Design a protein with these regions (language model features):
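Catalytic beta/alpha-barrel core
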Residues: 9-14, 93-96, 109-120
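Glycine/small-residue-rich loop that forms an oxyanion/phosphate-binding "nest" at active or ligand-binding sites
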Residues: 44-78, 83
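Acidic (Asp/Glu)-rich catalytic clusters
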Residues: 1-3, 23-36, 75-78, 165
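Active-site rim beta-loop-alpha module in soluble metabolic enzymes
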Residues: 120-165
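Glycine-rich, proline-tolerant flexible connector loops at the mouths of alpha/beta enzymes
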Residues: 8-21, 44-47, 91
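Active-site-adjacent beta->alpha loops and helix N-cap segments on the catalytic face
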Residues: 15-29, 95-102, 120-124, 182-184
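C-terminal domain-boundary segment and adjacent tail
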Residues: 185-204
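Conserved, mostly hydrophobic/aromatic
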Residues: 38, 84, 174
Length: 204
């Protein structure tokens, strides 16, 4: 996966250990992929996909802590965190606007790191599209609804190319936790290259 993707979102509030995260960072660095922080609500039981009523100041500090820990591991391989992409329920909370979104934006401002979100977010520095997630309008279909995840590599590639054509989409996401994630990622990258796109990291 690391040789297919040009940027790697490293989750650390929702799963994993310092050792597994260090291994992920090492693999991404070896492949030449950009490294982004993928902070979440502190929700290991729900893999960061359960909404939390975390107070804004506490949430800001949680994000600062998670990104800071990842950056320390990046320094160990001569790299740095290059952007922040919130994970799961935190991502959706930010897209809804409000105080939790302000808290994450404040953390990104203090860290002087860009925020990667869906392009309609007022806090997005860079906009992203999702190749293997179904949309309802401009938002992602909730994962608990039928058809929320696109498993067909050809359909994911087709959607990735359509999303890339939008002026405000700078990068295409493929989740790495699906059973056929590598096959889908290969198809999406091949589709983009066939369509004439120069596939490289949006923060390189």
């Amino acid at each position: 996966m690391y040789t297919i993707a040009t940027a790697t979102n490293c989750a650390h509030g929702s799963a994993g250990t310092p050792t597994s995260l260090a291994h992920t960072v090492s693999l991404a660095a070896r492949a030449g992929a950009s490294i982004g922080a993928h902070p979440s609500f502190v929700d290991r039981e729900g893999f960061g996909r359960t909404a939390q009523d975390t107070a804004p100041l506490e949430l800001r500090d949680q994000v600062l802590f998670q990104v800071g820990a990842l950056d320390a591991l990046c320094r160990g391989v001569g790299r740095r965190v290059q952007y922040i992409k919130p994970h799961g329920a935190l991502y959706h909370a930010i897209m809804a606007g409000g105080a939790q979104g302000e808290a994450v934006f404040e953390a990104s401002r203090l860290l002087e790191l860009p925020l990667l979100l869906m392009p309609q977010s007022k806090w997005a520095t860079y906009g992203e599209g999702f190749a293997e997630r179904a949309y309802d309008g401009d938002l992602l279909r909730p994962r608990d609804q039928e058809g929320a995840v696109i498993h067909d590599p050809w359909l994911a590639a087709k959607q990735g190319v359509l999303l890339a054509a939008r002026r405000n989409v700078h990068t295409i996401c493929v989740h790495g936790d699906s059973p056929n994630a590598v096959v889908v990622a290969k198809a999406v990258r091949a589709g983009l290259e066939t369509a004439g796109y120069d596939v490289r990291s949006f923060v390189a």
